[in-house]
Design a protein with these regions (language model features):
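Active-site neighborhoods and metal-handling regions in enzymes and metal-associated proteins
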Residues: 1-194
Length: 194
């Protein structure tokens, strides 16, 4: 019997051992990961549509972002924009019955706040029981506002982030941004289609 032993809880595995005591169990996790790592043309098209949804959300963000908005207010407007366009909300990740929230918005010093998130972004979140993403901080002029959202279309996802400024970005920020673009280009040169 093939099981995904990299994500299946031990209690579940023990239950299957009791239900099928004369069976051999095989870890098919590597096979599934390899199969899912290369996308068909159909799947790539769905991922493109998810990216287009995110692109339209980023364009909308550019139109509505204003100093004085609270991070959670801004997040709510963007989340409503996405949901009205069939974003599924929670997104599935490779884990056992695990879904994650689909985005983080952080501004200014909140960009440096660590959180419970396993991803690269954090943020204080709305409260201590959900310490990640948008919080109650007011967005100010001349500070970075980062939007890191997962676009989703029919179960296929793309994770994209953009940083906005209301006003002017400082020289140090622009230098780091240039470095990030160089790293992105190097990664793109190493990648392959599918």
């Amino acid at each position: 019997i093939g099981l995904e032993l990299d994500v299946l809880p031990v209690n579940n595995f023990r239950m299957y051992e009791k239900l099928f005591p004369h069976s051999e169990f095989v870890d098919i996790s590597p096979m599934i990961r390899k199969l899912r790592s290369v996308k068909s043309a159909y799947e790539i098209d769905l991922m493109r549509k998810a990216a287009e949804l995110n692109d339209s959300m980023f364009a909308y963000a550019r139109q509505i972002l204003r100093p004085g908005m609270v991070e959670m207010e801004f997040a709510g407007l963007l989340e409503a924009f996405l949901r009205k366009r069939e974003h599924q909300g929670l997104v599935r990740v490779r884990s056992f019955n695990n879904e994650v929230f689909y985005g983080h918005i952080m501004a200014g010093v909140n960009l440096a706040v660590p959180s419970c998130s396993v991803g690269p972004t954090g943020g204080p979140g709305p409260n201590a029981s959900m310490p990640q993403g948008a919080g109650t901080r007011v967005i100010r002029e001349n500070e970075p506002v980062q939007i890191d959202y997962v676009g989703s279309y029919k179960g296929y996802i793309v994770d994209q982030a953009r940083t906005f400024f209301i006003g002017q970005a400082g020289e140090e920020f622009l230098n780091v941004h240039d470095l990030a673009l160089k790293i992105q280009q190097a990664i793109m040169e190493k990648g392959k289609a599918g």
